[in-house]
Amino acid sequence: VPRLLFFHYDNGSRSQKVAIDLLKTFKGYLQCDGYSAYDAFENRKDVRLCGCLAHIRRHIESCREENREYAMQGLKFIQDLYNVEYMADERQLSYEERAALRQRLAGPLLDAFELWLQNTYPKVLKRSLMGKAIAYAYPLIPRMRHYLYDGRIFIDNNRAENALRPMVLTRKNMLFCGNRQAAENTAVICSLLGSCNCLLYTSDAADE
């Protein structure tokens, strides 16, 4: 299946309504961070929300100076989960084989991580960085479990995050698009160029 990149602009809004309108006919796996706008898809039978371990790691990573002991414990669970992915990559496993490996190795790790989050939360201040990190991560564990059973699902959505970075940098440099139509046009152009990069088209075109 070709990888396509799609940028969407809707009057500068990131509201839940924008996500619902955009994805009202979508069916399948929807991988995202913990942004509350996606909660609307939690109970849709034709959509499975998948979590992003990189976002969970980012929140726990931010606690290293405040509470190094707990932060390192949490990061160890996360690193072990990523190590399973590295193992699957090295073995060049099929989707089915990757899912089987995840269920055998990553499943127990995810269970242990969930238990650690549950047991650690009462030991920290809710308003502390660690308290907020755990409050972010714990509700997302059920969403993370979906990747255990389908090798096509990534453990995180870093590919989407990496595709977004050039757009963010461009936005900082340009400051403004000028008007809404210009912003919509920018989204179309970025979608086209981003998809070409995903398909390695621009590299071939440049070589020719």
Could you say what each language-model-derived stretch is?
Residues 82-140:
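Long, amphipathic alpha-helical stalk/connector segments used for oligomerization, subunit docking
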Residues 1-32, 36-44:
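RNase H-like nuclease fold core
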Residues 177-199:
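Catalytic phosphate/nucleotide-handling subdomain of diverse soluble enzymes
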Residues 38, 53-60, 155-172:
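Short amphipathic alpha-helical "interface-anchor" segments enriched in bulky aromatics
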Residues 45-73:
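Conserved beta-strand -> loop -> alpha-helix junction used to position metal-binding or nucleic-acid-contacting
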Residues 64-88:
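A conserved active-site cap/scaffold subdomain adjacent to cofactor or substrate pockets
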Residues 201-208:
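Conserved small/polar residues in nucleotide/adenosyl-binding loops
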